Amino acid sequence: MGIKDWPEGEGPRDKLLQKGAGQLSDAELLAVLLRNGLAGLNAVDLARSLISEFGGLRNLLCAPRNQVCRLPGVGPVKYAQLQAAAELARRVAQENLQRGQVLTNPDLTRDYLMRQLADRSYEVFAVLLLDSQHRVIQFVELFRGTIDSASVYPREVVSLVLEKKAAAVIVCHNHPSGNAEPSQADRRITERLKNALATIDVSLLDHMVVGDREIVSFAERGWIN
């Protein structure tokens, strides 16, 4: 059954229009995007089955195309709709942290980094470049793949900082496993970066590790002095 076939006022789309998107469950929101179910399953049932199959929305949205499209009721069109919605969410977060904005709200930074990195199926190491008044200059993804003390090169971070004339930086990376607890390698990387940036009088304000539903801040733990 498709969304258009629901009795008037009972479908997830009608509920969204009447009560707002915040009142819909994950499955109902996903159903609005999917629009149609398949034989024996309406759109909400299909959405529930997809969320269950992948263990949550995050895993569904970052799953490879071949894994998603192999399931009944989900073809290339529905996959494209889901990816478009995920990318729109990331771009909204990007707009919320525009160039020139002063970082006075830690929650804004956390929300931005969560949206940028939490749904990646691979590790990303990135740098948030700030000026002397802690205004945003740029967010740059520097390294992808397995992030350890041997794969992050301080000289490349220093080169980027000099190029963009940044006065302070926040570095961050994600853990695709979902567990945001920093490793010993993460702590070694941080120490190396802090020392390298100190040689050009640039402050390392924080290193944030992004997990599935949380972010660990080195600064909050007192690991950056």
From Swiss-Prot:
Keywords annotated in UniProt: Hydrolase, Metal-binding, Metalloprotease, Protease, Zinc
Top-level taxonomy: Bacteria, Pseudomonadati, Pseudomonadota, Gammaproteobacteria, Alteromonadales
Species per Swiss-Prot/TrEMBL record: Shewanella baltica (strain OS185)
Name under which the protein is recorded: UPF0758 protein Shew185_0376
GO molecular function terms noted in the UniProt entry: metal ion binding; metallopeptidase activity
Pfam family, any one: UPF0758_N
NCBIfam families given in the database record: PRK00024.1, radc
Ranges spanned by the short sequence motif JAMM motif, renumbered to the chain: 173-186
Family: Belongs to the UPF0758 family.
Ranges where the MPN domain occurs: 102-224
GO biological process: proteolysis
Annotated residues for binding of Zn(2+): 173, 175, 186
InterPro entries the record matches: MPN (IPR037518), RadC_JAB (IPR025657), RuvA_2-like (IPR010994), UPF0758 (IPR001405), UPF0758_CS (IPR020891), UPF0758_N (IPR046778)
Domain of life of the organism encoding this protein: Bacteria
